[in-house]
Amino acid sequence: MTLSAVVAQFPVTLSIQRNLEIIHSVLEQTTPGDWVVFPEGALSGYSTDPIFLKQINQQELTTGLRHIQKESERRKINVWVGVCINQDGKWFNTAHGFCADGKTQVYHKINLANHERGVFSTGNHLPVFELNTPDGKVRVGIQICRELRFPEQWGWLARCGAQVILHLNNAVDDDSFQSVWKSHLISRAAETQRFVLSANNAAPKQVSPTIAVAPDGQVIGEIVSAELEILRVELDLSKVSNWYLDQSRSDIVAIKSNNIQNCA
């Protein structure tokens, strides 16, 4: 099975309406069956200063989410977008997945950045989402920003059957670490033998590129830019493998979850 994916970056603002306009402009360039991934906080906006949360209009955010959901269903595409959202009085850093069949999936970031702690609540499990495509079902895992530094999370997603791992990123202002973050993403792909698609906020100094990496660790597309840009790649899922995972010495070192529902 081959998937067509669009990894989109743009300068994420604190204006929900402006972000939605740009997201919509990207969706207009898709074709049925596409998978589309946007950065962390792409709709709500994002900042390392948590005061930005006070500016989020929940009604405007809800309207934006509904618009993306309708467009995903109408265009027959799967869209993943970053959203900081208040649920039952708690803030979560999330990735919302809008499926071509009208379903919505949500991942709540489990490993928060230092400036997020005490402000955001953490997610409590690492789900693998099974999505329908015209050619069959595809299993996808999600990670957000700094979670690229925790390979055990990626390894768990792979062991739970994820074929593609999407990484919604918002890492800017210090490009001296760009080679480090790029290396992390290449390693996450190669060690799990999964496709990794990472969409970063567009900025003059990106900490990490917007990038697509194949299961063998080869970079199949990369963007380093402060502008709206789109990376279109084809993913041959036959390249996904458990060759290395099956050679793990799980009798000595094993990855396990404290949440038994994670691989459901």
Regions of interest found by a model, annotated:
Residues 128, 201-264:
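C-terminal beta-strand edge segments of enzyme domains
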Residues 1-6:
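Extreme N-terminal starter segment of soluble prokaryotic enzymes
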Residues 18-27, 148-155:
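Short, acidic/polar
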Residues 16, 24-100, 173-190:
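Cys-nucleophile CN-hydrolase/nitrilase-fold catalytic domain and related Cys-dependent amidase chemistry
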Residues 60, 64-78, 149-228:
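CN hydrolase (nitrilase-like) catalytic-core segments centered on the catalytic cysteine
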Residues 86-160, 173-183, 245-249:
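Active-site catalytic loop in hydrolytic enzyme cores
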Residues 94, 106-109, 167, 222, ...:
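Residue-level detector of high-confidence beta-strand sites
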